[in-house]
Amino acid sequence: MKSFFILLSILQECYGKDIVARIGGRNVAEKIGGARHRRQVLIRGSDEERRHKWFNNTVHYYFYEENFDFTVKESILRAMELISNHTCIKFSTEPSEKSIRMESDSTTIACYAEIGQVRENQLFSFNSDCYSAGVAVHELIHSLGFIHAHQRSDRDQYLEFKKNLDELNQTYQEQYKIWEYQEILVPYDVGSVMQYPNEEDEEYYPVRKYRTMANTMGSAIVAFYDYLMINKYYECSCANNLSCKNHGYPNPSNCSQCNCPYGFGGADCSQRAEPGATFQATETWQNVTISLDAGYRYLENNQKLPQVDFIYQFLWIMAPANKTTQIRVEKFVEGKCLPGCIRGGVEIKTNEDPRLTSPRLCCEETS
């Protein structure tokens, strides 16, 4: 029997910082996170909505040079790469009658996109206040036809709100209303890139029902189930019979490999993901210190900017059957307590379903 935890560091502000963890074991058999889940949500309840898919699974786009901040271009391109590497969706700059116009709206700090393929020359606004690839994926998934996770019909099983939604202004009601037409495709994952953060100081944000997931909400990491719901909706599949381990499935972008839950790797998800290390749990505590250095990206004018995506370190902790592994995060060097742990942190995989996001920690307050 093996357990593992994933060390995450976003390539934005955590440069070469240390995280110190202690690993141990005790003689107790314990089953964690055995709850059953309903399937995920998507707007697709009528013939009208079905026409909002992109033809031939290809999204055409162009950058509107008169009003686009090219410092965020890398974020969008990386987001497209992430989606196309895990699904059958392709992004093309070939001219098309129906395409997305990429702009940067300087009048707002918000980024936004229209839901699904809705018209010619439709809008996708992305500016420097958004910047990261994770936020760009969020908006691109809207463009593919998906609503927020917290607008699912089953969201009240996982979230609660401080105020009745009808007390909010119209803008926020639109962001939190449950859409009439939905199809549940994958389990609810509060770590979805489509889930808004848990902001306890903001009256209109959702609050998690389970305290351990507080810093998981608002993630900038694309969840396993985010890719799977795209593949299901766009009917992406592989003709071969590749056998995938550990709940993986054949990757429609490369049918010789599997899409694996975070922490698993190799062509068939039978190995530990790389880079990483494997430890053997013992009856006494072991100290482990991990350092990740994200580095920077440089523009042509030598302007130095944070990176747009995460780097990862995957640790497997091996233990005999009928043993429970104990993990204690001792400290973060300059860790930041931010919703979604968007500047880096640790995810300790505790869910029985390894495809679901587990609790994330990013500072002493959460560890």
From Swiss-Prot:
UniProt domain EGF-like: residue ranges: 232-270
Glycosylation site list: N56, N85, N169, N241, N254, N287, N322
Any single GO BP term: molting cycle, collagen and cuticulin-based cuticle
Peptidase M12A domain mapped to chain residues: 41-237
Main EC class the enzyme belongs to: hydrolase
UniProt KW Isomerase keyword: no
EC number(s) given by UniProt: 3.4.24.-
Subcellular location: Secreted
Cofactor list: Zn(2+)
Disulfide bonds: C88-C236, C111-C130, C238-C258, C260-C269
Cofactor details (free text): Binds 1 zinc ion per subunit.
InterPro entries the UniProt entry points to: EGF-like_dom (IPR000742), MetalloPept_cat_dom_sf (IPR024079), Metallopeptidase_nem (IPR017050), Peptidase_M12A (IPR001506), Peptidase_Metallo (IPR006026)
Tissue-by-tissue expression: Expressed in uterine seam (utse) cell.
Organism annotation: Caenorhabditis elegans
Name this protein carries in UniProt: Zinc metalloproteinase nas-22
Pfam families, sorted: Astacin (PF01400)
Job of this protein: Metalloprotease.
GO cellular component: extracellular region
Gene Ontology molecular functions: metalloendopeptidase activity; zinc ion binding
Keyword line: Disulfide bond, EGF-like domain, Glycoprotein, Hydrolase, Metal-binding, Metalloprotease, Protease, Secreted, Signal, Zinc, Zymogen
Leader sequence segment: 1-16
Active site: E139
Residues annotated for Zn(2+) binding in this entry: H138, H142, H148
PANTHER family: DISCOIDIN, CUB, EGF, LAMININ , AND ZINC METALLOPROTEASE DOMAIN CONTAINING (PTHR10127), ZINC METALLOPROTEINASE NAS-22-RELATED (PTHR10127:SF794)
Main localization of the protein described in the UniProt heading: secreted
